[in-house]
Amino acid sequence: MTHNHSNEEGSIGTSLHGVTAREQVFSFSVDASSQTVQSDDPTAKFALPVDSEHRAKVFNPLSFAKPHMRAFHLGWLSFFTCFISTFAAAPLVPIIRDNLDLTKTDIGNAGVASVSGAIFSRLAMGAVCDLLGARYGTAFSLMLTAPTVFSMSFVGGPSGYLGVRFMIGFCLATFVSCQYWTSVMFNGKIIGLVNGCAGGWGDMGGGVTQLLMPMVFHVIKLAGATPFMAWRIAFFVPGFLQVVMGILVLSLGQDLPDGNLSTLQKSGQVSKDKFSKVFWFAVKNYRTWILFVLYGSSMGIELTINNVISGYFYDRFNLKLQTAGIVAASFGMANFIARPFGGYASDVAARVFGMRGRLWTLWIFQTVGALFCIWLGRASSLPIAILAMMLFSIGTQAACGALFGVAPFVSRRSLGLISGLTGAGGNFGSGLTQLLFFSSARFSTAEGLSLMGVMAVLCTLPVAFIHFPQWGSMFLRPSTDGERSQEEYYYGSEWTENEKQQGLHEGSIKFAENSRSERGRKVALANIPTPENGTPSHV
């Protein structure tokens, strides 16, 4: 008899149904003890499949299931709301400058101020996440900065305008809590995509506000308010959104997959760390500072663009206020796809090439985006300028997504503070580029854009120096030292021998075990031992 083994009939392992873990197995038991074991399974309480740290191995953006997907949605929506507030003034600058008699220098300094405050708040947020949890950090940032958003309605001059924009910018610290929250909720194999979606959809608030604020301004004006009164009333909208999100985060959020940080610390399930130790291991790791520079030349540029792009199209191409807002909004709206794409590309590259693939992906996206930034500044017609802006936005935002496919692996113990330092790099880069290129009459806005692109190309080069002994770098292979080439050694080195004896490092060891996928498929397959019969053990 001839047997026809087709793909439709089965695949390798079908003769051992239920053994290979590739098939669905149907079974039931009437034994009470077996039912008890199933109900006691610690992973049974999760809606998504999880790893040994109870971090989700699947990403389902259409779900709001607790705790993983709920934390994801609360994180990005909080950041989205804060982005709207921070850049709410930018599309209304043509009206505000006439009302407050602002000069180009005043507007430029206010733009610098709007992102400079977050340099400090993001550093603080990193420590808050490590020590208190992402839920409190996010909610405090939203609620404490909401009054400053309302205060914009009562500004009377240039100094008040600058001061209020500086204080509103503190809320951008929610980016750090957002990325930290998703990093502790999702497995490393999908962290690039998840962080890309969370950060990208949050960044999209910079585009939405370019549409929202002119629309709200127009509606209020139609209701009978004067232009100089309408822009002031409009700021009650983003302030109200922050209050609502703060309440939702406190009432619905959860710090970690197994519960809130304070509760787990009291029960002894999670150790309570010291700020001095967390801070030390973050600042002494040179990779942290390279990420600081890299994010300053990707996210920093994006923040700068949010402040200048609407006015650039309004003045250079004589567009109407609402039209300029629509064009400018397209830059920020690209985050919906571009940043998640960058994170997903990082994950895909890691599956084959490991961490080295993530680093190459980051360098390619960031360099290409910077080159299109140069082109944007040299564009002489509206269609070419819009095309250059869109290509620039895709490259730069994809680079941001790819960068946070790397950042979660720099440290386990100081994850929050490293996220904070990296995020602060974005604000520092934005403040620096606005100060250098857009705060005086030395350069036109077009010249400033091109020079900013050149600066970004140069600042992307240090990615080549990021080297992990267990995974290698862009040009160098992993360490040949047997002990140092292990993930457990890298993450365990952040703990002293005394701390290890107390078992405080166990979370880092679990993280190390789940990070072996960063070796890449080729390395992983090469390391699988071959038994005497010559058949690889993974087949």
Swiss-Prot record:
Lipid bilayer topology: Multi-pass membrane protein
Annotated stretches, region: Disordered: 501-539
Comp. bias regions, Polar residues: 530-539
GO biological process, one term: nitrate assimilation
Keyword Phosphoprotein found: no
Compartment annotation: Membrane
Up-regulation conditions: Not induced by nitrate.
Tissue expression pattern: Expressed in roots and shoots.
Position of the signal peptide: none
Membrane-spanning intervals of the chain: 76-96, 112-132, 137-157, 166-186, 190-210, 233-253, 289-309, 324-344, 359-379, 384-404, 418-438, 448-468
GO terms under cellular component: membrane
GO molecular function: nitrate transmembrane transporter activity
Keyword entries, A-Z: Membrane, Nitrate assimilation, Transmembrane, Transmembrane helix
Protein family according to the UniProt entry: Belongs to the major facilitator superfamily. Nitrate/nitrite porter (TC 2.A.1.8) family.
Cited function: Involved in high-affinity nitrate transport. Acts as a dual component transporter with NTR3.1.
Subunit structure, interactors included: Interacts with NRT3.1.
Protein name: High affinity nitrate transporter 2.3
